[in-house]
Every structure is written in C-alpha cells, then in structure tokens.
Amino acid sequence: MFLIYEYDIFWAFLIISSVIPILAFLISGVLSPISKGPEKLSSYESGIEPIGDAWLQFRIRYYMFALVFVVFDVETVFLYPWAMSFDVLGLSVFIEALIFVLILIVGSVYAWRKGALEWS
C-alpha cells in the first residue's frame, strides 16, 4: 500500500533543493546594483576596445564533435557502474551491456561514414 508519509525525507529534500536556488536568485536580484549605460553594453577584452564584431559564428563541426563527445561521455557514465559490479550481476546484464556497446559502435560507424568526424 502506498503511504505518503514514507516519503517525508524525499519531499523535504525536494522542497529545500527547489527553494534554495529560487531564494538565491531573488536575493541577488534585490541586492545587486542597477547600472545601465554604454559601458555595460560594450565588450571587454583585457582592457582593450574590441576590434570588429564581438559576435562570431562557430562552424557546425564544433557542435558535431561536441555531440559525439557527449554520446561517448554518456556511454562511460552508463558502463562504469556496470563494470564495478560485473561479478555480481551475471550473464544477462553482460548481454545487455554488450548490446548497448554494439548499438554505440553502430552509431559511431554511421557518424564516421556520414562524415561527422571529418575535419575539413
């Protein structure tokens, strides 16, 4: 039977972890000085006035490499706990992890063949 009072610690943690950031934003908004002017709108480059436009466009290749990095970073996050408890989990979890790695290998081969990993 589901009893709500069994989760008192969870609800307290959830409320506290939600209230603290909200309070931090509110307090910083109230205490921060309000200053507007052309100095605040200009870019700062080591004390020197910037030459040219401050906004630069990045090539899409940076984002592709970042996306591939995130995929393999998430793979590491999922495989590390599995590797630490490999001897306890058994054969079925080994097969599941093997399928997971094979799917990632297929994805990386696909990205490689599509040219997402080429720097040109």
UniProtKB/Swiss-Prot annotation:
PANTHER family: NADH-UBIQUINONE OXIDOREDUCTASE CHAIN 3 (PTHR11058:SF9). Its EC number is 7.1.1.-. It is an enzyme of class 7 (translocase). This is NAD(P)H-quinone oxidoreductase subunit 3, chloroplastic. It is a multi-pass membrane protein. The keyword NAD applies. It catalyses: a plastoquinone + NADH + (n+1) H(+)(in) = a plastoquinol + NAD(+) + n H(+)(out); a plastoquinone + NADPH + (n+1) H(+)(in) = a plastoquinol + NADP(+) + n H(+)(out). It is found in: Plastid, Chloroplast thylakoid membrane. It holds the Pfam family Oxidored_q4. Keywords: Chloroplast, Membrane, NAD, NADP, Plastid, Plastoquinone, Quinone, Thylakoid, Translocase, Transmembrane, Transmembrane helix, Transport. GO terms for molecular function: NADH dehydrogenase (ubiquinone) activity; quinone binding. Signal peptide: none annotated. The chain crosses the membrane at residues 9-29, 64-84, 88-108. Gene3D superfamilies: NADH:ubiquinone/plastoquinone oxidoreductase, chain 3. InterPro entries: NAD(P)H_OxRDtase_bac/plastid, NADH_UbQ/plastoQ_OxRdtase_su3, NDAH_ubi_oxred_su3_sf. Its main location: plastid. NDH shuttles electrons from NAD(P)H:plastoquinone, via FMN and iron-sulfur (Fe-S) centers, to quinones in the photosynthetic chain and possibly in a chloroplast respiratory chain. The immediate electron acceptor for the enzyme in this species is believed to be plastoquinone. Couples the redox reaction to proton translocation, and thus conserves the redox energy in a proton gradient.
